[in-house]
Regions:
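An N-terminal assembly and electron-transfer interface module characteristic of large anaerobic redox
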Residues: 5, 9-634
């Protein structure tokens, strides 16, 4: 039997001695060495192999490995031992040859062994990879289409096509079939093509509506557990959800319509949004061109959509790696799921799913990995997103807003000392504008100075001039010990232990009078104006202000819980660079429920006016306090 070295087909001597279950000529089973860098093609391929074995017999042997697998020297040696004796090698490379560090070595050994090789990007034809491939151009194009279109049927026809091309069999082979690249998916209804049809099946008037989008590859591979988890949690919270799969870029050759079309056809109707917020699990930027960073659109579609977009992170760490990591996310996660989406103005949130190896496939030897939901983080992002969404359903008159001055060090002469910003005047301007927009203010102070004087006349973070009794009398509120104890017991056990070790049993001693925690600040109708609580002791603030280890005092936690649960703020504003919230102990990025910024801000929508000339620390605020940055000039 001959083997093609440059085209993928040659003359064969056909024997009638070896036929499959349907009588088709089958000289031998095809051996394919397959490298996948995404894993999304693995599950459809395995299903196709199982069906093919049932229908045709043992006609294909595929050994499949990921780039992570091949980083292990023994795995690499075993794979190449099979590959150099195979009938075809398929290198499916998301991101080009650079994504596979061992590409040159693998390609060289395949050429030396005279093995036909297909190498290509998963989503677009790469001229360099096409020139490196040793199968013919027509064969290369056909394999690319089968792989790019994806799914079980295309995978099965790919195997049959390769049998015909490389072993001279004569199976009936279907042409590559374009899948639905865009559509609505729901675990109770499957695939739904149009928004109107989905609304007839699953929409309740008067509820907040959350959009959710994810890659079509997850839908084709049935890698949907994290999607199902988000859908179920949104609906459990009495909200509508519109879950949409898509191929994010418009590609005429592939037939994909892209993110802008999806927004116009699934998240908008008659030019108006039908969602109140969008959870995005997509990676990279959707509005910037690669490399030159020029905008793809005159008016970005997110601006037309006009709702908050909350970035849900899919980490390529395992959940165990993520939980144990002080950094939180690996550099690839940060680049793809945080830094680039920030160009689109997304609000960075938390990891909702982590990579997990579920089993090793017996047919291909592939380690099967899926994105498994991180249940508590799913609840977190849904709660945060719903709170953003509800702002569209609450009248301005009813909205409750907490405005927080920074106060470092915690003295009265240091209230509102944001860098490059006249904080008192700025808050006065905010109050004036809120009143003009119909927010529920009782009265507008005469000036920023008058505002600060009114705060100083009550209780502040400066404990030098007042006894605990006086502070308690002038406090806007007191948190009883039993109430704080309930809040405290909601924290993870390890966090409770750390806080007790540093600050004593709750409620501690800082800002406490007769067992009650003192809440500084003033109220003005539905507006609360407060001071960010101190990180620690007044006597030594600088030693702990940027401490990576010292847990927050009981008073710090109680203050933010009071804002959320007693004052019942719909949103909070932190005024200017910078406070302590985003510098609290915890992971660098991709926070867990045991990270103190996450504990403090909870699920409150956070708006943060921030000076434009300090993107580094502004980035810290975005990524660790889930805030919407509003830049101001110097």
């Amino acid at each position: 039997v001959g083997k093609s070295t440059s085209h993928g087909c040659t003359g064969f001597k056909i024997s009638n001695d070896n036929r499959d279950k349907n009588g088709d000529v089958n000289m031998k089973k095809i051996k394919i060495a397959y490298i996948s860098t995404t894993g999304l093609d693995v599950f459809p391929l395995i299903t196709a192999l199982e069906e093919l074995e049932t229908e045709k017999g043992d006609v294909a042997e595929v050994i499949l490995r990921s780039k992570d697998d091949l980083a292990d020297p023994k795995t690499m040696d075993d794979f190449m031992s099979f590959a150099v004796g195979s009938d075809l090698a398929i290198l499916s490379l998301h991101g080009g040859k650079a994504i596979l560090g061992s590409f040159d070595e693998i390609a060289g050994r395949l050429r030396d062994a005279n093995v036909p090789m297909y190498a290509q990007d998963t989503s677009k034809l790469d001229p360099e990879l096409m020139s490196i491939s040793t199968v013919g151009r027509d064969v290369h194009t056909s394999i690319f289409r089968y792989l790019a279109y994806g799914g079980k049927d295309n995978s099965k026809n790919l195997l049959l096509y390769c049998l015909n091309q490389f072993l001279g069999t004569s199976y009936e082979v279907g042409e590559p079939k374009r899948p639905p690249w865009e559509g609505i998916y729901h675990p109770d209804f499957g695939y739904i093509a149009t928004l109107d049809e989905y609304f007839r099946k699953n929409y309740k008037e008067g509820r907040p509506t959350i959009g959710l989008w994810f890659y079509s590859g997850f839908w084709q591979a049935d890698n949907l557990r994290f999607v199902d988890s988000l859908i179920r949690e949104i609906e459990r919270r009495d909200a509508n959800v519109i879950p949409v799969f898509l191929y994010s870029l418009k590609d005429v050759e592939l037939g994909t319509k892209g993110a802008e079309w999806v927004i116009d056809n699934y998240f908008m109707k008659d030019g108006q949004p039908v969602i109140d917020a969008l959870i995005s699990t997509l990676m990279f930027s959707l509005t910037m061109k690669p490399r030159d960073e020029e905008k793809l659109f005159d008016k970005p579609f997110f601006e037309r959509l006009g709702v908050p977009v909350i970035k849900a992170i899919l980490t390529y760490n395992t959940e165990e790696e993520w939980r144990e990591s002080f950094q939180g996310l690996n550099p690839m996660d940060v680049s793809m799921s945080i830094a680039m989406p920030e160009f689109d103005g997304m609000l960075i949130a938390v990891p909702v799913a982590a990579k997990k190896m579920t089993e090793t496939d017996t047919l291909t030897g592939a380690k099967l990995t899926r994105f498994e939901p991180i249940d508590e983080r799913v609840r977190k992002i849904v709660s945060l997103t719903l709170n953003w969404a509800k702002l569209r359903h609450i009248s301005n008159q009813e909205k409750r807003v907490a405005i927080i001055f920074h106060n470092y060090p915690p003295r009265n002469d240091r209230i509102g000392t944001a860098f490059g910003l006249d904080s008192p005047v700025s808050v006065y301007n905010i109050l004036r504008d809120l009143e003009g927009e119909g927010y529920g203010l009782e009265s507008l102070p005469e000036s920023g100075q008058v505002l600060i004087e009114s705060m100083i006349s009550r209780v502040t973070n400066d404990r030098r001039w007042s006894s605990p009794e006086m502070m308690a009398e002038k406090a806007i509120d007191l948190v009883p010990a039993e109430q704080y104890r309930k809040w405290f017991e909601e924290l993870p056990g390890a966090i409770q232990e750390k806080m007790v070790m540093s600050w004593g049993e709750p409620p501690g001693e800082l800002f406490v009078h007769q067992g009650e925690l003192i809440i500084p600040g003033i109220s003005n109708g539905n507006i609360f104006i407060g001071l960010q609580p101190p990180r620690g002791f007044l006597e030594n603030p600088e030693a702990i202000y940027h401490s990576p280890d010292l847990p927050i005092p009981h008073h710090y936690y109680a203050y933010y819980r009071w804002i959320r649960d007693v004052f019942r703020a719909d949103l909070v504003m932190h005024i200017g660079k910078h406070g302590s919230l985003e510098w609290l102990p915890g992971k660098s990025v991709g926070l867990s429920e045991s990270c103190f910024p996450d504990i403090a801000i909870s699920d409150l929508p956070n708006i943060y006016p921030y000076i434009i000339n300090n993107p580094g620390e502004g980035t810290q605020a975005k990524r660790r306090s889930y805030c919407c940055i509003i830049d101001h000039l110097i």
